[in-house]
Amino acid sequence: EDFASDEQEQSKLYWTDERVTGGEDPIELGSNNSGRSVGGSTVHFTMVSLRFRPEWFRSRSLLGYGVDWPVSAQEMWRYYEEAEQMLQIAGPVNYPWGPPRGRYPKREHPMNGAAQILARGCERMGIQWATTPLATLSSPHGEAHPCVYRGFCGVGCSTNAKQSALVTWIPKAIAHGAEIRDLAMVGRIETKHGEATGVHYHREGQWRFQRAKHVVAAGYSIETPRLLLNSANGEFPSGLANGNGLVGRYLMVHSNHAVWGEVEEEVRWYKSPPSIAITEHWNYTDEGKDFHGGYCFMSQGPLPMLWAQTVATARGMWGMELRREMTKYNHMVGLKIVGEVEPQARNRVEVADEEDQYGLPIPRVSFAYSKNDKRLYEHSLESMRQVLEAAGSRNLWTQDGTAHLMGGCRMGSEPEQSVTNADGRTWEIPNLWVCDGSLMPTGGGVNPSLTIQALACRIGDRITEMGKRGEL
């Protein structure tokens, strides 16, 4: 009952606290990449659940760009499967990209009108497409009902069909003894003699302290670096785990540019999850590219308020002109990319002089695209235009955008080049760990949520194994 079918009301799920954003290409922060609820951003994500292309885990060695991960594709494949089983991913019998794999736990979702446009355009262009693997139920699971295709996925699922962390990992953790302290803000990690001793957090109007033998930071790519930097003290004057100055650096997003158009037939693109059909053609094809990396693109289905905001912002429409444009809503179609962005040291999270309501310095985010990122962007726009035109779309226009967050506390094999090791254990403080998307050394050309959850499964196993061996 906390998830109303009301776009404006559900903006409470987004992290909209003040943040300073700048650089050559400032990124938007909030609903497109940050959540503030039990379950985090998975409560409002659109459930796209894709594995990395295996070569991306060794992109420097095999593809000539980026940096190699400290974990292998072979090891991650096992944890991808574990995450897919927990989330009951619904996908096609034969997903056409990547190594051979077993079937998804649930059957694929039916195609809506927007997905049929992508499929039609891709087929006419000779490009392979598939239904998108999604973390929402296509058949009953336990007490949860399957998706009823209301289209409110991005503002919280009121039926529990969406398999967010709120209804999967968290209940399991609570059943095994975890305690959730919601409506709390962690401000600082305390250290003594080179080790973390606990966290200071604000709850119910006052600051409190929780002692801990181990601290795991999982605030995502802005709040985790912010927490480590705000925890600077006499022992660690530049921030925790930041002796090499890399905390907050190598922040990444995904290009999330769109091409929109209209068609004669009635599409009603809001019926169903937003991204029902996908092509990863340009993730797995390296020929004919003038850029490193890759991208996928998916069909779209924005709700009315979001669509009105999109049109008003991207096209400058207002008043009667906007009202007339909105009458075309059921005939609109669109494609959006998830495009890889190179890791750059200049893209970073720092702390600003301004403070929030808790007296904590707020984050300052700087971002700029590389020349390679811009070439990928131009290539993807042309590809999407061609597919929509092949499907019979007209009056095409484009929209800039970014989505997702990755990096900021990158994992690696060498202490000089990373914040943590392959297990998320910080090099400088042995009982301080990071377990979120900030660990990712590269972003790939797919949504990061499945990779983040697979990494968390792996880190959990490693902590358990080390504990059993007495190494903690």
Which residues does each PLM region occupy?
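Conserved N-terminal glycine-rich FAD pyrophosphate-binding loop of Rossmann-like flavoproteins
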Residues: 1-18, 35-48
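A conserved FAD-binding loop/helix module that cradles the flavin
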Residues: 442-463
